[in-house]
Amino acid sequence: MAASVTRVLKGAGGRQLLLMVARRRPVLMQPFLLMPRKFWVSSALRSEDQRQPPFSASSTHAETQGHAEEQYQQKQPPPRYTDQAGEESEGYESEEQLQQQILSAALQFVPDFGWSADAIAEGAKSLDMSAAAAGMFEDGGSELILHFVTQCNLQLTELLEKEQKLVQLGTSEKKPTAQFLRDAVEARLRMHIPYIEHWPQALGMLLLPRNIPSSLKLLTAMVDDIWHYAGDQSTDVSWYTRRAVLTGIYNTTELVMLQDSSPDFEDTWKFLENRISEAMTMGDSVKQVASTGEAVIQGLMGAAVTLKNLTGLNQRR
């Protein structure tokens, strides 16, 4: 059955079909997707046993090297930045912290400047820094988008964890799986609303070859988190099919949202509800798995055409 899934999904390009990357995955993973990235915030909250990697000499060496680098960094003076008056100031523990602050501040300027270095420069100025601080980002627009997606995924994880704790405390009823999935995807997509006019630009940039590994890792981590908090503990082929299906639902709903002019995106949420309902009635037979793969492929092809038409245009009329 796993071979059938692999043959069906192998031929299509796009970020859904590399869904194999996730923290609690079975062993058939693509190793090149596990490379760390500077701005990543882990969105999966697991037990220590689940997080613990297997012991190896290389991991021991990495830990030793990391400890040495940490000691070196502790000896260095704190980074300086230049404010708008041209004076140098200190106030951030690390360059990474400074970059995170600038990117977060830049988000409020995306509606006016798009996902661009200009938005980052305005964000720096809002923190009383020189606009030249935007120069510390090699690919400003892409880094701003990836920062935003990372923060959205983190917010979703915090929301799902809070709901889980309420259920564990007995103060809230456990939702049926279909409702849980629908609410989780809707909550995540609603985070795009303040930036919806510029989201076609964001999707186009996320699909650039240099950004695909990062955007895929964020997407698969988000989907895996949703299934984790939904209570999925499968270890067979259904682990893959469930994540493939939810990824397809998320991406197609995201595209529907870009063209939805109904009040509060009502048509989008109705579309999402219908897709979730259909997915929950699907079994794990070989024929149904194949149908799922074909649907994902068709969704990818449709997404590529739609994005080509949407990118850079004002879609919501």
Curated annotation (Swiss-Prot):
It comes from Xenopus laevis. Pathway: Cofactor biosynthesis; ubiquinone biosynthesis. GO terms for biological process: ubiquinone biosynthetic process. Keywords: Lipid-binding, Mitochondrion, Transit peptide, Ubiquinone biosynthesis. A 1,2-diacylglycero-3-phosphoethanolamine binds at R243. Structurally similar to the bacterial FadR protein (fatty acid metabolism regulator protein). It comes from the Eukaryota. InterPro entries: COQ9_C, COQ9_HTH, Ubiq_biosynth_COQ9. The keyword Mitochondrion applies. Belongs to the COQ9 family. One of its GO terms (molecular function) is lipid binding. Residues 50-97 are annotated as: Disordered. Residues 53-63 have a biased composition (Polar residues). This is Ubiquinone biosynthesis protein COQ9-A, mitochondrial. Homodimer. Heterodimer; two heterodimers of COQ7:COQ9 come together on the same side of the lipid pseudo-bilayer and form a curved tetramer with a hydrophobic surface suitable for membrane interaction. These two tetramers assemble into a soluble octamer with a pseudo-bilayer of lipids captured within. Interacts with COQ7; this interaction allows ubiquinone (CoQ) isoprene intermediates presentation to COQ7 and facilitates the COQ7-mediated hydroxylase step. One of its GO terms (cellular component) is mitochondrial inner membrane. Disulfide bonds: none annotated. It is found in: Mitochondrion.
